[in-house]
């Protein structure tokens, strides 16, 4: 049968490309400030490419936040710093 792994647990995966080497600790801190303490932030490809994996998160109404909304929140936070 099908064996589930972390890739199938749900959530949002984002790939962000920077013009210069990414500061991973800063990216992690910015993502954690949004309430994603369990997010994974890592380089892939080059030091300028960052993959961010966000776990499923519920909104104030108890329903899961849409991936597009999560992505927009993270990109807004990363662009603000």
Model-found features: residue ranges?
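A structural signal for conserved, well-ordered secondary-structure elements
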Residues: 1-81
């Amino acid at each position: 049968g099908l064996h589930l792994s972390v890739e199938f647990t749900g959530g949002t995966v984002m790939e962000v490309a920077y013009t210069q080497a990414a500061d991973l600790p800063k990216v992690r801190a910015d993502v954690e400030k949004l309430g994603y303490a369990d997010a994974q932030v890592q380089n892939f490809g080059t030091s300028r490419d960052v993959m961010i994996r966000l776990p499923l998160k519920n909104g104030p109404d108890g329903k899961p936040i849409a991936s597009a909304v999560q992505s927009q929140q993270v990109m807004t936070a990363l662009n603000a710093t």
